[in-house]
Regions:
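Sec/Tat signal peptide C-region and signal peptidase I cleavage site
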Residues: 15-20
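Structured interaction patches on ligand/partner-binding surfaces of diverse proteins
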Residues: 82-112
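Structural beta-strand segments of beta-rich domains
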Residues: 21-25, 65
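Sec-dependent N-terminal signal peptides
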Residues: 4-14
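Short, ordered, surface-exposed loop/turn motifs in non-cytosolic proteins
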Residues: 32-44
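Intrinsically disordered, low-complexity Pro/Gly/Ser/Thr-rich segments with frequent PxxP/GP/PP motifs
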Residues: 48-73
């Protein structure tokens, strides 16, 4: 019985990373405002990728909504976002992991311009 349990645990451990790789990365908007533009760049650069808000049906990410992130490898990124009040903010050193959700909270929006 122990042998069977051990085999099951080994198979489960091998299967979990596969499932995570199949799930998309997602951004969870925990700010107070709807986001109209959301860009990612490798940390420390200004090589902004495509507007990820275009991945959403209405082109925006409401407060407490999740957004599918596409064409972005796991790694450490800076994010630039624009909200409905036209405030532009940079959030640095976000860790994006395959199949995981990362979030930005209002209190993290310290580098903003209007």
């Amino acid at each position: 019985m122990r042998k069977l349990a051990f085999i099951f645990l080994v198979l489960a451990a091998c299967y979990s990373p596969t499932l995570a790789a199949e799930r998309p990365m997602r951004f969870w908007n925990l700010t107070r405002h709807t986001i109209t533009e959301f860009y990612l760049a490798p940390a420390g650069t200004t090589n902004w990728g495509a507007n990820q808000c275009k991945n959403d049906l209405d082109g925006t990410v409401d407060a407490d909504e999740r957004l599918r992130i596409t064409n972005t490898a796991p790694g450490v990124y800076d994010a630039r976002l624009v909200d409905v009040s036209k405030r532009t903010c940079i959030v640095r050193n976000l860790k994006l992991e395959a199949g995981e959700i990362f979030s930005i909270e209002e209190r993290e929006l310290t580098s903003c311009t209007q």
